[in-house]
Amino acid sequence: MHELSLCMSAADIIREQAEQHGIARVTDVWLEVGALADVEESALHFCFDIACRDTVAQGCTLHIDVIPAQAWCWDCSREAEIMQHAGCCPHCGSERLRITEGDDLRVKSLEGE
Protein backbone atom coordinates (compact mmCIF):
# COMPACT_ATOMS: atom_id res chain seq x y z
CA MET A 1 0.00 0.00 0.00
CA HIS A 2 1.96 3.01 -1.26
CA GLU A 3 -0.76 5.39 -0.07
CA LEU A 4 0.83 5.40 3.39
CA SER A 5 4.25 6.50 2.12
CA LEU A 6 2.60 9.19 -0.04
CA CYS A 7 0.63 10.45 2.96
CA MET A 8 3.71 10.43 5.20
CA SER A 9 5.50 12.62 2.65
CA ALA A 10 2.46 14.91 2.38
CA ALA A 11 2.30 15.18 6.19
CA ASP A 12 5.97 16.24 6.26
CA ILE A 13 5.27 18.96 3.69
CA ILE A 14 2.21 20.12 5.63
CA ARG A 15 4.20 20.32 8.88
CA GLU A 16 6.97 22.31 7.16
CA GLN A 17 4.53 24.73 5.53
CA ALA A 18 2.55 25.21 8.74
CA GLU A 19 5.76 26.00 10.62
CA GLN A 20 6.96 28.44 7.94
CA HIS A 21 3.64 30.31 7.96
CA GLY A 22 3.01 30.28 11.70
CA ILE A 23 -0.01 27.98 11.54
CA ALA A 24 -0.68 26.28 14.87
CA ARG A 25 -3.48 24.04 13.63
CA VAL A 26 -4.24 22.94 10.07
CA THR A 27 -7.98 22.74 9.43
CA ASP A 28 -8.14 21.81 5.73
CA VAL A 29 -5.76 20.24 3.21
CA TRP A 30 -6.24 19.98 -0.55
CA LEU A 31 -4.37 17.25 -2.39
CA GLU A 32 -4.11 16.93 -6.16
CA VAL A 33 -3.93 13.31 -7.20
CA GLY A 34 -3.06 12.44 -10.76
CA ALA A 35 -5.43 10.08 -12.54
CA LEU A 36 -2.50 7.70 -13.08
CA ALA A 37 -1.15 7.82 -9.51
CA ASP A 38 -2.73 4.43 -8.76
CA VAL A 39 -4.13 5.45 -5.39
CA GLU A 40 -7.37 4.28 -3.85
CA GLU A 41 -9.24 7.29 -2.51
CA SER A 42 -10.60 5.52 0.59
CA ALA A 43 -7.12 4.17 1.40
CA LEU A 44 -5.73 7.67 0.94
CA HIS A 45 -8.19 9.08 3.49
CA PHE A 46 -7.37 6.28 5.95
CA CYS A 47 -3.60 6.66 5.56
CA PHE A 48 -3.79 10.45 5.71
CA ASP A 49 -5.46 10.24 9.11
CA ILE A 50 -2.68 7.95 10.33
CA ALA A 51 0.10 10.12 8.87
CA CYS A 52 -1.30 13.28 10.46
CA ARG A 53 -1.82 11.79 13.92
CA ASP A 54 -0.09 13.87 16.63
CA THR A 55 0.76 16.67 14.16
CA VAL A 56 -0.64 20.15 13.51
CA ALA A 57 -2.84 18.53 10.85
CA GLN A 58 -4.51 15.97 13.11
CA GLY A 59 -8.26 15.97 12.52
CA CYS A 60 -8.11 18.29 9.51
CA THR A 61 -10.49 17.89 6.59
CA LEU A 62 -8.90 16.28 3.54
CA HIS A 63 -10.07 17.41 0.10
CA ILE A 64 -8.96 15.34 -2.90
CA ASP A 65 -8.97 16.64 -6.47
CA VAL A 66 -8.29 14.02 -9.14
CA ILE A 67 -6.60 15.66 -12.09
CA PRO A 68 -6.39 14.16 -15.58
CA ALA A 69 -3.04 12.98 -16.82
CA GLN A 70 -1.25 14.56 -19.74
CA ALA A 71 0.67 12.57 -22.32
CA TRP A 72 2.73 13.33 -25.40
CA CYS A 73 1.84 11.36 -28.52
CA TRP A 74 4.89 10.18 -30.44
CA ASP A 75 2.88 9.69 -33.64
CA CYS A 76 1.03 13.00 -34.03
CA SER A 77 3.29 15.12 -31.76
CA ARG A 78 0.42 16.52 -29.71
CA GLU A 79 -0.45 16.69 -26.02
CA ALA A 80 -3.38 14.55 -24.95
CA GLU A 81 -5.42 14.26 -21.77
CA ILE A 82 -5.80 10.67 -20.58
CA MET A 83 -7.44 9.05 -17.56
CA GLN A 84 -5.88 5.57 -17.64
CA HIS A 85 -2.53 3.94 -18.35
CA ALA A 86 -3.79 2.05 -21.39
CA GLY A 87 -5.10 5.21 -23.00
CA CYS A 88 -5.02 6.07 -26.67
CA CYS A 89 -4.34 9.44 -28.21
CA PRO A 90 -7.70 11.17 -28.74
CA HIS A 91 -6.25 12.91 -31.80
CA CYS A 92 -4.87 9.99 -33.83
CA GLY A 93 -5.68 6.80 -31.87
CA SER A 94 -2.04 5.89 -31.27
CA GLU A 95 -1.04 3.98 -28.15
CA ARG A 96 2.50 5.40 -28.28
CA LEU A 97 2.16 7.91 -25.46
CA ARG A 98 4.68 9.30 -22.97
CA ILE A 99 3.15 10.40 -19.66
CA THR A 100 4.18 13.99 -18.90
CA GLU A 101 1.92 14.79 -15.93
CA GLY A 102 -0.71 13.24 -13.69
CA ASP A 103 1.01 10.26 -12.09
CA ASP A 104 1.81 11.97 -8.80
CA LEU A 105 0.30 13.42 -5.65
CA ARG A 106 0.76 17.06 -4.59
CA VAL A 107 -0.18 19.17 -1.62
CA LYS A 108 -2.10 21.90 -3.43
CA SER A 109 -2.97 24.09 -0.44
CA LEU A 110 -3.82 24.14 3.22
CA GLU A 111 -5.75 26.32 5.64
CA GLY A 112 -5.26 26.73 9.33
CA GLU A 113 -5.47 28.96 12.33
Curated annotation (Swiss-Prot):
Which of UniProt's keywords are assigned here?
A: Metal-binding, Nickel, Zinc
- Biological process GO terms, please? protein maturation; protein modification process
| Family matches, as InterPro entries | HybF, Hydgase_Ni_incorp_HypA/HybF_CS, HypA/HybF
Annotated residues that bind Ni(2+) are located at 2-3
Q: Where does Zn(2+) bind?
A: 73, 76, 89, 92
**A single GO molecular function, which one?**
zinc ion binding
Concerning Gene3D superfamilies, the annotation shows: 3.30.2320.80
Q: Which family does it belong to?
A: Belongs to the HypA/HybF family. HybF subfamily.
Biological function: Involved in the maturation of [NiFe] hydrogenases. Required for nickel insertion into the metal center of the hydrogenase.
Write the protein's name.
Hydrogenase maturation factor HybF
